[in-house]
């Protein structure tokens, strides 16, 4: 029987008054204990995971241990952990949402042997707070009382160890109850886990950092920064309009000087501000870090400053360029932080000379983060000299107003600086990507498909699904070497003369049950991560490359959409959604499908499915396939024309296809040539996504997962408009339709690169496409700007996107709802779905950033060992696409590289080009105009560089010990580069790009073979981050994007 209590909360209002609120608090005789030793499992109603059977004790951390040592409690070796509700709520209220979410994710993770016990709702565990008792003492007392009850509840069969940092609690409770031990966390590790070296090192690091903070707080220091305002003052100021809330974004090129705050939830329509707010200098930043949600106070207009328009090195100071800034813009200072964005940071220790220069205080070291946007971090360690050549991970603990730098602690070593695996590990950590192998529990949920036990269609599924194996010609069109085929197509003529178009997608949700171990893991990963030389799958290969891959000639489960189209106008008459069984007849490559579409039938010899057919059957099947591809293309043209009429955009994205040999080694990297069949497949997928979006929204208007692409801010198009104007083009950005038409008309007859660059600039002006729950915003905000569709979602790639898995479940639920059948499984509420969407959006950004950074890593490693003065491959043609105060930005089509080329060097000399067009540095000055920049020397020579001029560029690498290496561009001639032997750029680029990846990998392998004894740290790192063993690095690689500055297509498209 429930018992009712009254819980008193004291809240402070915006006006500063204390408000007393009384809430009802109900206590239950039984709450889930999640223990296999439970004597009353039915009464406890266990739901979810249970604690492991193979433990010697249960450990219960108190609230302070959970707050300070959560990263150690995350170690998978530590099992049988019981987190009390009291401790979890303390984390939520005192450490903020980020750490609380980290704790929640730990509790959800099936790989970790830990559970949540709701002690404050259990009748025997709940203790009211006594008069005069501090919150901290009550929390410790409540947790101990719950630990005693839990021990007796398990019939005294499992010892309980409560770990706490409260010495009084250890003295008071240490020997009070037999079977319940109360000790410090340090003693717990010493006695129970003496061999867990990593945990001991991390614990020592945390303790040392805490002691340093306590010592600093006791010492008298002058304040380096103003104190942050109290939360109630910040909230009141935001509500009144005095303060502005937003996310801090630091300029990586001027990290010490410039940061910007973009308003949250504000637009030009409801705010006087039409631009970001500039935060100038570290003092005004007031201890906020890139990504923090901050509160800003605007400065008076006479104190506003302009953003820097000059090119600068990442480590330059405020006066490095000596150039005037742009027009003054809204400028402010940070007065408070609402949410910290602290995470794991990869750092490098200072050189030996720098360590020695710090003198007697050498145990406190300033380490430099790999990310330029993060300030140096002070940590306490005695390993500085030992770890000088390694990249290590640290965490920030605090940043007091009396300290110039934040304080942190050492976590672990990643790998040697410059080592390929160490650099890849750095990219993963910096993007918060965890790629540990799938666990045994997850793999046990997977179906079996072996020669001894082959997988077969079950009779039950045959009864429930529509069987298309004999009635439909189903085929796939994919890149060469593709293993995870998650979409196939079909088209046929119906008896009434109309056409039937079908899109058939792998039925992943048949194999991945909601809230199963593999479902939770896929939800955590959210996407497959593609790096330049490998990929980390969202699902195990038995699904992604086998049973969920719609391979040719085998039976597979699918979810299908089939439209009946008018035979002449292709108008959609009706649509059918449902589960099917298919057998794909052909697994075509894009190139082969295009050849068939163009009438070149000789390509049929390269299609395996035709090889064993007699001439008559071969001819008949070939005619059937050619007709199907042609009809699909005709339908796609019609669908695309309809979207074009509504303003669909075609933006610039450069893709490359990786060509593999029979041994799965890389053979070539070929830039993806635009083929009409690409558009055909894409249009069919867009059509399917659009119709599924409409269906799930109609059935679940408040909890459907859709994808929106908001219109961009008009001010972001200013550079695009000005650049187009320089070539005599007018870009109308009032709507997606006018923008699309303008870009189509901005075609220079003599230089197609101009249109590519204009489309790239349009892409950079775009806002990101995001997943959202339909219950969280108004219907008019559902629109997808880039695709010109009122509703859109992702349905067609469930093998590599968790969003598509959610959409498949929603579609199945919608179909059941139409049939008035019971909906199986619990759908996400609007609140939970919105939280999931935020997580998926975050992981998608991480995937894009890691892909871009890994590509840049390979570019740098390729050029690093080449002498730019003598190596022909370091010279290339470049196109100027932006003018700055002291240089230009250049795009190199041959390698897809964008970068800065200086026209004034650090010595103040400017570039000069003589009669032979070769450049040299001389005293002089630069004069910048809107679309050009002129360099004039003191002896009267001058050279002018215009937007979209072709110049000859030398590529070299700027090596950095603490950060990633970067490509450096130097203009060596103001004339276009003449390719030797009159080779065309697009013909030579595949060979060069192949060498880029192939040579880097080869050099790494040679270095590894030459190294007789590997460093243990590298081995540990390899085990943690390498997902596959025993095969080539390229086994999993099917396709990568050749990024310039952005992952273009993912920002706006399918």
From Swiss-Prot:
Residues 236-309 form the CSD1 domain. Residues 365-431 form the CSD2 domain. Gene3D superfamilies: 2.40.50.690, 2.40.50.700, 5'-nuclease, Nucleic acid-binding proteins. Its EC number is 3.1.13.1. It comes from Pongo abelii (Sumatran orangutan). It is found in: Cytoplasm. PROSITE patterns: RIBONUCLEASE_II. Keywords: Cytoplasm, Exonuclease, Exosome, Hydrolase, Magnesium, Nuclease, Phosphoprotein, RNA-binding. This is DIS3-like exonuclease 1. GO terms for molecular function: 3'-5'-RNA exonuclease activity; exoribonuclease II activity; RNA binding. The keyword Heme does not apply. Its cofactor is Mg(2+). It comes from the Eukaryota. GO terms for cellular component: cytoplasmic exosome (RNase complex).
């Amino acid at each position: 029987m429930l018992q009712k209590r009254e819980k008193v909360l004291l809240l402070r209002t915006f006006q500063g008054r204390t408000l007393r609120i009384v809430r009802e608090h109900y206590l239950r005789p039984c709450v889930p204990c999640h223990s296999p030793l439970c004597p009353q499992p039915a009464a406890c109603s266990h739901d979810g995971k249970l604690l492991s059977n193979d433990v010697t004790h249960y450990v219960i951390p108190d609230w302070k241990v959970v707050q300070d040592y959560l990263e150690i409690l995350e170690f998978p070796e530590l099992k049988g952990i019981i987190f009390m509700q009291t401790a979890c709520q303390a984390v939520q209220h005192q450490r903020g949402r980020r750490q609380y979410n980290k704790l929640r994710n730990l509790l959800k993770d099936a790989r970790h042997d830990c559970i949540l016990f709701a002690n404050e709702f259990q009748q025997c565990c709940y203790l009211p707070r006594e008069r005069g008792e501090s919150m901290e003492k009550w929390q410790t007392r409540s947790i101990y009382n719950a630990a005693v009850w839990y021990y007796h509840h398990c019939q005294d069969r499992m010892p309980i160890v409560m770990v706490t940092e409260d010495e009084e609690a250890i003295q008071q409770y240490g020997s009070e109850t037999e079977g319940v031990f109360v000790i410090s966390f340090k003693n717990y590790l010493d006695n129970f886990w003496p061999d867990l070296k990593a945990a001991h090192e991390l614990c020592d690091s945390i303790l040392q950092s805490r002691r340093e903070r306590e010592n600093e707080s006791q010492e008298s220091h002058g304040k380096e920064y103003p104190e942050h305002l109290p939360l109630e003052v910040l909230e009141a100021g935001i509500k009144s309009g005095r303060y502005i809330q937003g996310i801090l974004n630091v300029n990586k090129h001027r990290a010490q000087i410039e940061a910007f705050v973009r308003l949250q939830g504000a637009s030009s329509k409801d705010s006087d501000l039409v631009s970001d707010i500039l935060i100038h200098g570290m003092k005004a930043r007031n201890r906020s870090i890139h990504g923090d949600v901050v509160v800003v106070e605007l400065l008076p207009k006479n104190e506003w400053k302009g953003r820097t328009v000059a090119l600068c090195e990442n480590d330059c100071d405020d006066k490095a360029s000596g150039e005037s800034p742009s027009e003054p813009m809204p400028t402010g200072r940070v007065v408070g932080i609402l949410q910290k964005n602290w995470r794991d940071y990869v750092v490098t220790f200072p050189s030996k000379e720098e360590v020695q220069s710090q003198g007697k205080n050498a145990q406190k070291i300033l380490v430099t983060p790999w990310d330029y946007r993060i300030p140096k971090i002070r940590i306490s360690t005695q390993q500085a000299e030992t770890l000088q050549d390694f990249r290590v991970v640290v965490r920030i603990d605090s940043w007091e107003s009396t300290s110039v730098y934040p304080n942190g602690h050492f976590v672990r070593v990643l790998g040697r600086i410059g080592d390929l695996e160490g650099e890849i590990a750095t990219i993963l950590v910096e993007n918060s990507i965890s790629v540990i192998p799938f666990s045994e529990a997850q793999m046990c949920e997977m179906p079996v498909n072996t020669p001894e036990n082959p997988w077969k269609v079950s009779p039950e599924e045959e009864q429930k699904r529509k069987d298309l194996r004999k009635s439909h010609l189903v085929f796939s069109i994919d890149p060469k070497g593709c293993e995870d085929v998650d979409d196939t197509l079909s088209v046929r003529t119906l008896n009434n003369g109309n056409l039937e178009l079908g899109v058939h997608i792998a039925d992943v949700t048949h194999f991945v049950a909601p809230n199963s171990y593999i479902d939770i893991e896929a939800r955590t990963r959210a996407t497959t991560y593609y790096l330049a030389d490998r990929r980390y799958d969202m699902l195990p290969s038995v699904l992604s490359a086998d049973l969920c891959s719609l391979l040719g000639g085998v039976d597979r489960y699918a979810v299908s959409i089939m439209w009946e189209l008018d035979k002449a106008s292709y108008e959609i008459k009706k649509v059918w959604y449902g589960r099917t069984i298919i057998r794909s007849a052909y697994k075509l490559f894009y190139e082969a499908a295009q050849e068939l579409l163009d009438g070149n039938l000789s390509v049929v010899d390269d299609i395996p499915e035709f090889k064993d057919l007699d001439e008559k059957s071969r001819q008949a099947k070939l005619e059937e396939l050619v007709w199907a591809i042609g009809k699909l293309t005709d339908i796609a043209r019609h669908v695309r024309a309809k979207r074009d009429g509504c303003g669909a955009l075609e933006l610039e994205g450069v893709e490359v296809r990786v060509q593999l040999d029979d041994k799965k080694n890389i053979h070539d990297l070929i830039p993806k040539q635009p083929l009409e069949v690409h558009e055909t497949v894409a249009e069919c997928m867009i059509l399917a996504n659009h119709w599924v979006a409409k269906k799930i929204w109609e059935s679940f208007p408040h909890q459907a997962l859709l994808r929106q692409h908001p219109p961009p801010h008009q001010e972001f198009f200013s550079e695009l408009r000005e650049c187009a104007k320089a070539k005599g083009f007018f870009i109308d950005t009032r709507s997606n339709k006018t923008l699309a038409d303008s870009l189509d008309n901005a075609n220079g007859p003599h230089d197609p690169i101009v249109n590519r660059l204009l489309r790239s600039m349009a892409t950079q002006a775009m806002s990101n496409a995001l997943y959202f729950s339909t219950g969280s915003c108004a219907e008019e905000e559902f629109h997808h700007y880039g695709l010109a569709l009122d509703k859109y979602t992702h349905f067609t790639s469930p093998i590599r996107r968790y969003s598509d898995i959610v959409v498949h479940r929603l579609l199945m639920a919608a179909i059941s709802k139409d049939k008035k059948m019971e909906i199986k499984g619990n759908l996400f509420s609007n609140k939970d779905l919105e939280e999931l969407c935020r997580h998926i959006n975050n992981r998608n950004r991480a995937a894009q950033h890691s892909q871009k950074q890994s590509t840049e890593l390979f570019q740098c490693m390729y050029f690093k060992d080449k002498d730019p003065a003598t190596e022909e491959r370091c010279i290339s043609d470049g196109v100027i696409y932006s003018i700055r105060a002291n240089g230009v930005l250049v795009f190199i089509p041959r390698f897809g590289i964008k970068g800065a080329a200086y026209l004034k060097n650090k010595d103040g000399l400017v570039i000069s080009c003589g009669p032979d067009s070769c450049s040299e540095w001389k005293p002089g000055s630069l004069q910048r105009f809107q679309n050009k920049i002129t360099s004039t020397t003191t002896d009267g020579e001058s050279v002018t560089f215009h937007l979209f001029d072709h110049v000859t560029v030398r590529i070299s690498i700027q090596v950095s010990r603490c950060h990633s290496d970067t490509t450096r561009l130097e203009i060596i001639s103001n004339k276009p580069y003449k390719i030797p032997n009159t080779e065309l750029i697009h013909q030579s680029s595949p060979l060069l790009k192949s060498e880029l990846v192939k040579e880097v990998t080869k050099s790494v392998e040679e270095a590894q073979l030459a190294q007789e004894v590997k460093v243990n740290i590298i081995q540990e790192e390899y085990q943690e981050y390498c997902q596959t063993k025993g095969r080539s690095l390229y086994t999993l690689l099917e396709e990568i994007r050749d990024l310039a500055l952005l992952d273009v297509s993912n920002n706006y498209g399918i």
